[in-house]
Amino acid sequence: MVSVTGCAVLAMTATLAGALAGNAMAQTPDAGCALPSEPEGIPAALDAAISGPADKDRGCMKALLIPDARMLFASLGADGTSSYRLETVDEWIARVKARGRARLEERQLKFHIERYGNIADLWSSYALHSDGKQVARGINSIQAIKDAGGWRVSSIMVQAESATAPLPKEYLP
């Protein structure tokens, strides 16, 4: 058994707090990519970061997500078979850039937030448009955390609507 004195605990706590504060400060986004001050601002921030031409600078997307964030894209086949693809933010950016100059716009349709202290879960329906035409819609499940700079996304799970999984009416505008 290890015995730790009160002074040692305070020293370890101060060291950890300093490391965490330094980590959060080092990851603060540029002024042009202000983080949302409340979780209600996350859907609009994501729409702005995702929308645009494929070769758009994705610095704001990287700033909005924590460094180790993951994006999971789930799908449901016509036969009911479930599959998924897990990506880092950098992998997502590379895949988007491969589209060429195609411009996409993501718009949140409706969202619901559950919040406790510095964590929040957002359940959001979206529509994806290309050249003004809707090409997809689905659900985003977004987990977020508040740090020194504002609210950031730790993970996003996405499932596009399909014939076997239509959007529920409560998530339509």
Give the residues covered by each predicted segment.
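Acidic/histidine-rich, surface-exposed loop or edge segments in extracytoplasmic proteins
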Residues: 43, 69, 73-77
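Bacterial N-terminal signal peptides
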Residues: 6-19
